[in-house]
């Protein structure tokens, strides 16, 4: 083969290789385009199902090792349309209480970053339920948890997290600087009320969707305080009760009507022989019912009911099944304050059904231990101590604490009635458990159902002391 033939042969081979390579590249491009078309079609199909992808990323230190955790969840999208919560439904008929949530925050906090808290409560919008709580500006098992038995300090803040989750810096939302608080949703936005400042001049800061809208200055200069549970929204107006004055004698009690964070009306209760603190309130057929704590002289609970014009009625739960702590043994009740063991108290709640009442209370008469729900079919109006149903939720041997009511509106549940629910604070640490340097709590919650329920104990369950306590 002469040199020219060699050149022609080599050129032909190179051209053939080039053509083959070009064909392969064109095939690759076509393959990628087809694959992309299939994926795009699949994504469009997913969009029809109205789903969204949410990625949670959490970075932390574990035993001096940096760990980055990424968790991608595909969840069905919800209709986030705003609506006014009517609040005009009656309470759902119920036979008992089903466990709804348990956050186990003290157990988790022995090894994880969990806030030191107290006064947790739950409130629901038409889309979700959230746990609100008052932090101490500290984490469990950390040096700043020392001395957190104190109720009022400049480090306390109202925060919230998804219900059932342990409150941590990674899942919690700041709401307000506060050592006393309330919150509720009107269907369009969250109203938060946070009280902070000195005992003789505290100020309540009202926020609507996170923006300050109003302030209320202490009018008696004696520890302005509010509910430590959810406020109530009816037809676009939200209602809350505040107390200012002595905790062991007559004080001043005011109801506030609030629209989009602005106060539109307020009244002072004429109740010289009653004592209202830390009220647990709920809507029922367009009115608001509040069951409160008498820290002055009643071992039964006071109540106040009012309409949207703030026309009100007051009284005490008449049942001989007493709801406060401390309290005497069940016996003869009264529609006025029951003075036996009437001093001091604990935040609590009840639900009225006509002449009957569901009473939530500690199982112990003298300490914040255990918790039970009792159905007294005539307890709202009659003074005997007969009851039909008792459901245990925390055993006598386990710590409890504050408790309060919250409701789930029909706009959330799809029911044609207002579902009654409650939460129980499970306090751990000081002052009762002196092996610790801190005070905090976890929480459980239950909702009323017209089906089978169970007696059991859902305690906090943390093993104390922690490393920081030793």
Curated annotation (Swiss-Prot):
Annotated GO CC locations: host cell plasma membrane; membrane; virion membrane
Cofactor requirements of the protein: Ca(2+)
Virion surface face of the membrane: 28-470
The record's account of how the chain is modified after translation: N-glycosylated.
Ranges in the topological domain labelled Intravirion: 1-6
Any one biological process term the GO annotation gives: viral budding from plasma membrane
Ligand binding (substrate): 118, 152, 277-278, 293, 368
Chain positions carrying an annotated carbohydrate: 44, 58, 63, 68, 88, 146, 235, 365, 455
Catalytic residue positions: 151 (proton donor/acceptor), 402 (nucleophile)
Region (Head of neuraminidase): 91-470
Family of the protein in this entry: Belongs to the glycosyl hydrolase 34 family.
Miscellaneous comment text of the record: The influenza A genome consist of 8 RNA segments. Genetic variation of hemagglutinin and/or neuraminidase genes results in the emergence of new influenza strains. The mechanism of variation can be the result of point mutations or the result of genetic reassortment between segments of two different strains.
Subunit field text: Homotetramer.
Function: Catalyzes the removal of terminal sialic acid residues from viral and cellular glycoconjugates. Cleaves off the terminal sialic acids on the glycosylated HA during virus budding to facilitate virus release. Additionally helps virus spread through the circulation by further removing sialic acids from the cell surface. These cleavages prevent self-aggregation and ensure the efficient spread of the progeny virus from cell to cell. Otherwise, infection would be limited to one round of replication.
Protein name: Neuraminidase
Gene source species: Influenza A virus (strain A/Brazil/11/1978 H1N1)
Organism taxonomic ancestry: Viruses, Riboviria, Orthornavirae, Negarnaviricota, Polyploviricotina
């Amino acid at each position: 083969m002469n040199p020219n033939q060699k050149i022609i042969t080599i050129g032909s081979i190179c051209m053939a290789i080039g053509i083959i390579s070009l064909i392969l590249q064109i095939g690759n491009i076509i393959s990628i385009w087809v694959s992309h078309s299939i994926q795009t079609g699949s994504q469009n199909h997913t969009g029809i199902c109205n789903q969204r992808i949410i990625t949670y990323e959490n970075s932390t230190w574990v035993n001096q090792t940096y760990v980055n955790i990424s968790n991608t969840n595909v969840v069905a999208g919800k209709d986030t349309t705003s609506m006014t919560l009517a609040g005009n439904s009656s309470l759902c008929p119920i036979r008992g209480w089903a466990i709804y949530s348990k956050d186990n925050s003290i157990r988790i906090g022995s090894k994880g970053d969990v806030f030191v808290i107290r006064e947790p409560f739950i409130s629901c919008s038409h889309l979700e339920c959230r746990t609100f709580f008052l932090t101490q500006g500290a984490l469990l098992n950390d040096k700043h948890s020392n001395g957190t038995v104190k109720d009022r300090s400049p480090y306390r803040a109202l925060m919230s997290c998804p219900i059932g989750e342990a409150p941590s810096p990674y899942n919690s939302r700041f709401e307000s600087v506060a050592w006393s608080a309330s919150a509720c949703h009107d269907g369009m936005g969250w109203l938060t009320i946070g009280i902070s400042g000195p005992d003789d001049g505290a100020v309540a800061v009202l926020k609507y969707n996170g923006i300050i809208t109003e302030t209320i200055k202490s009018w008696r200069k004696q520890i302005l305080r509010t509910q430590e549970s959810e406020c109530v929204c009816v037809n676009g107006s939200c209602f809350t009760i505040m107390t200012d004055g002595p905790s062991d004698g007559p004080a001043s009690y005011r109801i506030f009507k609030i629209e989009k964070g602005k106060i539109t009306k307020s009244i002072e209760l004429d109740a010289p022989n009653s004592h209202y603190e830390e009220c647990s309130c709920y809507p029922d057929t367009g009115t608001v019912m509040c069951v409160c704590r008498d820290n002055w002289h009643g071992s039964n609970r006071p109540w106040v009911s009012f309409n949207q014009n703030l026309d009100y009625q007051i009284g005490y739960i008449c049942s001989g099944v007493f709801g406060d702590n401390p309290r005497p043994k069940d016996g003869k009740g009264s529609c006025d304050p029951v003075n036996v063991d009437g001093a001091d108290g604990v935040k609590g709640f009840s639900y009225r059904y006509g002449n009957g009442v569901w009473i939530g209370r500690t199982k112990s008469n003298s300490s914040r231990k255990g918790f039970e729900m009792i159905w007294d079919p005539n307890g709202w109006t009659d003074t005997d101590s007969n009851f039909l149903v008792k459901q245990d939720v925390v055993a006598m041997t386990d710590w409890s604490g504050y408790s309060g009511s919250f409701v789930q509106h029909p706009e959330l549940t799809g029911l044609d009635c207002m579902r009654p629910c409650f939460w129980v604070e499970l306090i751990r640490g000081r002052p009762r458990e002196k092996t610790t340097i801190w005070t905090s709590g976890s929480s459980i919650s239950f909702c009323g159902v017209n089906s089978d329920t169970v007696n059991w104990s859902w305690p906090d369950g943390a093993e104390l002391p922690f490393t920081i306590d030793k």
